[in-house]
From Swiss-Prot:
This is Mitochondrial tRNA-specific 2-thiouridylase 1. It is found in: Mitochondrion. The gene is TRMU. It catalyses: 5-taurinomethyluridine(34) in tRNA + S-sulfanyl-L-cysteinyl-[protein] + AH2 + ATP = 5-taurinomethyl-2-thiouridine(34) in tRNA + L-cysteinyl-[protein] + A + AMP + diphosphate + H(+). Catalyzes the 2-thiolation of uridine at the wobble position (U34) of mitochondrial tRNA(Lys), tRNA(Glu) and tRNA(Gln). Required for the formation of 5-taurinomethyl-2-thiouridine (tm5s2U) of mitochondrial tRNA(Lys), tRNA(Glu), and tRNA(Gln) at the wobble position. ATP is required to activate the C2 atom of the wobble base. Disulfide bonds join C101-C223. Residues 171-173, 335-336 are annotated as: Interaction with tRNA. CDD domains: MnmA_TRMU-like (cd01998). Residues 402-422 are annotated as: Disordered. Signal peptide: none annotated. During the reaction, ATP is used to activate the C2 atom of U34 by adenylation. After this, the persulfide sulfur on the catalytic cysteine is transferred to the C2 atom of the wobble base (U34) of mitochondrial tRNA(Lys), tRNA(Glu) and tRNA(Gln). The reaction probably involves hydrogen sulfide that is generated from the persulfide intermediate and that acts as a nucleophile towards the activated C2 atom on U34. Subsequently, a transient disulfide bond is formed between the two active site cysteine residues. Residues 96-98 are annotated as: Interaction with target base in tRNA. InterPro entries: MnmA-like (IPR004506), MnmA-like_C (IPR046885), MnmA-like_central (IPR046884), MnmA-like_central_sf (IPR023382), Rossmann-like_a/b/a_fold (IPR014729). It comes from Pongo abelii (Sumatran orangutan). Keywords: ATP-binding, Disulfide bond, Mitochondrion, Nucleotide-binding, RNA-binding, Transferase, tRNA processing, tRNA-binding.
Length: 422
């Protein structure tokens, strides 16, 4: 008789992870619920919902009659996620801590805790995503040695597991999983909600006494900020660096700000005394000035070229067609739930890529992740380190005057005018 499979499910205190645990129980697995505490609310005077979330996760386990564990990754989160968050903002970039958290905390720390401490055969989360493995295939996976060197040997990991988009395309969360490095973790992960819609998940919760999580507002934004003012929060950790708001059209000074790193491209600039809204289109890291333009559709907000850091490829590193041709057509997005944009990737020798979008996109920003897709498959992602000239710059013929948008320590393989080396 085959032993009952043990699945350790990450519980956030929300409806998605609660229903994920419920569905695992229905499949006959031995399920253990684990709540991860990643931020110490005692560090701040602001509001943090971690304690309430933990209580809700514990109550889920009581309703489902499964064991409950709580584990603290406060130190790891600070070192690997929050410190990176601050460093990126200090460089004037716009980081995505959710992507970094999944990479370092959920699919590294939590995965190893579940396997090594709780004896899990597999882990599960409430993410809306799928893999190329069925449940039984997940349980048949053996430990794979961590790859060495710049790229994984494509013959070392046969039939690598693929990360696939969820049935609910609007709720799909492969974007946030695009930096999960460990094939070992991914091939031993179950996503019970991958084939379901959010509305159906809510229906399941309502029919199974999970009303306390069903009624909660969906968590948005960063857990460590809560309801606090973002600018005030950031200035608790970073020194103010006052500068000017300058019109991109005539170089007129329109106002002052407390730090160029507080703004991301596409964001509305809060400039007192102006009737119409102005939007951030450039940042000068040397002088500390923020360039702004009127109208939300100003051409200075649109670009069709960017360069990433070395891309993390999930299943095939890098894809064979990209290695062979040095170019590859696919789609990308740099914000969750934005429409996929057709693009062409150009591979550099150091594993970075140039991304040329078929059409200019609004509000590209360094520090964000460009996440690549081919059909239903999420191929991986790379951090945006450099932007090409805006449509406004090209219209004025000022390509050479483009404001630097990355740290000098991150110099890319430059082509003329920031064009990819084709």
């Amino acid at each position: 008789m085959q032993a009952v499979r043990h699945v350790v499910c990450a519980l956030s205190g929300g409806v998605d992870s609660a229903v994920a645990a419920l569905l695992l129980r229905r499949r006959g697995y031995q399920v253990t619920g684990v709540f991860m505490k990643n931020w110490d609310s005692l560090d701040e005077h602001g509001v943090c919902t971690a304690d309430k979330d933990c209580e809700d996760a514990y109550r889920v386990c009581q309703i489902l009659d499964i064991p409950f564990h709580q584990v603290s990754y406060v130190k790891e989160y600070w070192n690997d996620v929050f410190s990176d968050f601050l460093n990126e903002y200090e460089k004037g970039r716009t980081p995505n801590p959710d992507i970094v958290c999944n990479k370092h905390i959920k699919f590294s720390c939590f995965f190893h805790y579940a396997v090594d401490n709780l004896g899990a055969d597999a882990i599960a989360t409430g993410h809306y995503a799928r893999t190329s493995l069925e449940d039984e295939e997940v349980f048949e996976q053996k430990h794979i040695k961590k790859p060495e060197g710049l790229f994984r040997n494509r013959f070392e990991v046969r039939n690598a597991v693929k990360l696939l988009q969820a049935a609910d395309s609007f709720k799909g969360q492969t974007f946030f999983l695009s930096q999960v490095f460990s094939q070992d973790a991914l091939r031993r992960t179950i996503f019970p909600l991958g084939g379901l819609t959010k509305e159906f998940v809510k229906k399941i919760a309502a029919e199974n006494r999970l009303h306390h999580v069903l009624q909660k507002k969906e968590s948005m934004g960063m857990c460590f900020i809560g309801k606090r003012n973002f600018e005030h929060f950031l200035l608790q950790y970073l020194q103010p660096r006052p500068g000017h708001f300058i019109s991109i059209e005539d170089n007129k000074v329109l106002g002052t700000h407390k730090g160029w790193f507080l703004y991301t491209l596409g964001q509305r600039a809060n400039i007192g005394g102006l009737r119409e809204p102005w939007y951030v289109v450039e940042k000068d890291s040397v002088k500390g000035d923020v360039f702004v333009a009127p109208r939300t559709d100003h051409p200075a907000l649109y670009r069709d070229l960017l360069r990433t850091s070395r891309v993390h490829w999930i299943a095939e590193e890098p894809p064979a067609v990209l290695v062979r041709d040095k170019m590859m057509e696919c789609h990308f997005r740099f914000r969750h739930q934005m429409a996929l944009v057709p693009c062409v990737l150009t591979l550099n020798q150091d594993g970075t890529v140039w991304v040329t979008a078929v059409q200019a996109v609004r509000a590209l920003a360094t520090g964000q992740f460009a996440v690549f897709y081919k059909g239903d498959e999420c191929l991986g992602s790379g951090k945006i380190l450099r932007l090409g000239p805006s449509a406004y710059t090209l219209q004025k013929g000022q390509c050479g005057a483009e404001v630097a948008t990355e740290s000098p320590t991150d110099s890319p393989e430059d082509g003329p005018g920031l064009s990819p080396l084709l």
